[in-house]
From Swiss-Prot:
It catalyses: 1,6-anhydro-N-acetyl-beta-muramate + ATP + H2O = N-acetyl-D-muramate 6-phosphate + ADP + H(+). One of its GO terms (molecular function) is phosphotransferase activity, alcohol group as acceptor. This is Anhydro-N-acetylmuramic acid kinase. It comes from Variovorax paradoxus (strain S110). Gene3D superfamilies: 3.30.420.40.
Length: 375
């Protein structure tokens, strides 16, 4: 392609803000020219959080939230262009994920649905850049889960010769990519799926009891003691016994779900609950690495959870013999990986290349993902 500059914008289930990258794919390799981030305005964050569960006047509220998110996205895109001295006319496309508020693949009628709030038409108008959005619906239409979509990008970025690699993205929800060695004979399939909660429950508990949006470095969790009974109840959810392909979200793992698990532990010290939630995330992620990726001796961690030192320590404790390392040493800093993935997916859309992996999502085959909204 003549133009190999793409913007990727991602706001994940953590609802902590928008991450954006300006990525250069010249020669088929990725180089990040600029990175920018913006926190959610409090009112928009609260509305997006509320839209995760059924409520009154949802269509009206979702439409206005989409407008607000498009404006926030446009601000991040503008910052990327300013920081890199790049005119909008040089950017081939902007991949904008949107904000997932419902994810119910294959349910109800065999197809189900996934809903990412966004207004890509407004985003194209505000930025003057072609926008690619709605990445997940095409995979659902082909019988897939629509998630996770990052394993294809993880393969492009992290796969290496002679060594299988596991990649753990810890956002609000955690997902795992298991990458065969790049030179493995027979081109074995990539495996990927959502492990379960990542930061979502920890962040909720931190906000509720400390007023902080997250537990910085996991220090609060490290001050508490794990509650074995609560941990067992958290781990007993049927989701964890399901075999891949599988995906999940705040539809399941939300404050109401946590409250039900906490009911027998009324009176527990908040720090002990935080310690237990951190152990919960570490234990379910590590269990999936051991169950499905036991040949991987390198676990690359990205997403906001990679910055939680206590969580990383607990992962290492559960995975003796596995090198657990942040993605920085292997190509991109943790907070840039998902945004870069959606720049890569936008590029794949323009090139009419499949962006999903059927071995990951369970779709009937590879599909070109996303819808294009011309500037």
């Amino acid at each position: 392609m003549a133009g190999e500059l793409f913007i990727g914008l991602m706001s994940g289930t953590s609802l902590d803000g928008v991450d954006g990258v300006l990525a250069d794919f010249a020669d088929g390799r990725i180089a990040v020219r600029a990175y920018a981030t913006a926190p959610f305005p409090a009112a928009l964050r609260a509305e997006l959080m509320a839209l995760n569960t059924p409520g009154d006047n949802e269509l009206h509220r979702a439409a206005l939230a989409g407008n607000g998110l498009a404006r926030l996205y446009a601000g991040v895109a503008s910052q990327l262009l300013a920081d890199s001295s790049t005119p909008a006319s040089q950017v081939a496309a902007l991949g904008a994920h949107g904000q997932t508020v419902r994810h119910r693949p294959t349910e109800f009628d065999g197809v189900g649905y996934t809903l990412q709030i966004n207004n890509p038409s407004l985003l194209a108008e505000l930025t003057g850049i072609d926008v690619v959005a709605d990445f997940r619906s095409r995979d659902l239409a082909a019988g897939g889960q629509g998630a996770p979509l990052v394993p294809a990008f993880h393969r492009a970025l992290f796969a290496r010769a002679g060594q299988p690699v596991a990649v753990l993205n810890i956002g609000g929800i955690s997902n795992l990519s298991l990458l065969p060695a790049a030179d493995a004979p027979g081109e074995p399939a990539v495996l990927g799926f959502d492990c379960g909660p990542g930061n979502a429950l920890m962040d909720h508990w931190s906000q509720l009891h400390t007023g902080q949006p997250f537990d910085r470095g996991g220090r609060w969790a490290a001050s508490g003691q794990v509650l074995p009974g609560l941990l067992a109840r958290l781990q007993a959810d049927p989701y964890f016994a399901k075999a891949p392909p599988k995906s999940t979200g705040r539809d399941l793992f939300n404050p109401a779900w946590l409250s039900a698990c906490l009911a027998p532990a009324i009176g527990a010290a908040p720090a002990d609950v935080q310690a237990t939630l951190t152990e919960f995330t570490a234990s379910v992620c590590a269990a999936d690495v051991l169950r499905y990726g036991s040949d991987s001796k390198l676990l690359i961690v990205c997403g906001g959870g990679a910055l939680n030192d206590h969580l990383i320590e607990r992962l290492r404790a559960h995975l003796p013999g596995v090198e657990v390392a942040a993605s920085t040493a292997h190509g991109l800093p943790p907070l840039q990986v998902e945004a870069a993935a959606f720049a890569w997916l936008a590029r794949s859309t323009l090139r009419r290349e499949a962006g999903n992996l059927a071995s990951v999502t369970g779709a009937r085959g590879g599909r070109v993902l996303g819808a294009i909204y011309p500037a």
